[in-house]
């Protein structure tokens, strides 16, 4: 059986990257929440 996590840098960036987050309203909300919380890393 194949494991669920098959790492890929391209897929990681496309799905969870900064530009992917900024593309939708809810994604921008995630970025703002993480900024407000003071996260060192905002997204992948």
Curated annotation (Swiss-Prot):
It comes from the Bacteria. PANTHER family: LARGE RIBOSOMAL SUBUNIT PROTEIN BL34M, MITOCHONDRIAL RIBOSOMAL PROTEIN 34 FAMILY MEMBER. PROSITE patterns: RIBOSOMAL_L34 (PS00784). One of its GO terms (cellular component) is ribosome. Pfam families: Ribosomal_L34 (PF00468). Gene3D superfamilies: 1.10.287.3980. This is Large ribosomal subunit protein bL34. The keyword Ribosomal protein applies. InterPro entries: Ribosomal_bL34, Ribosomal_bL34_CS. One of its GO terms (molecular function) is structural constituent of ribosome. Keywords: Ribonucleoprotein, Ribosomal protein. GO terms for biological process: translation. Belongs to the bacterial ribosomal protein bL34 family.
């Amino acid at each position: 059986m194949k494991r669920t996590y098959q790492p890929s840098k391209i897929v990681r960036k496309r799905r969870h990257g900064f530009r992917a987050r900024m593309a939708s309203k809810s994604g921008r909300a995630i970025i703002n929440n993480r900024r407000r919380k003071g996260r060192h890393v905002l997204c992948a």
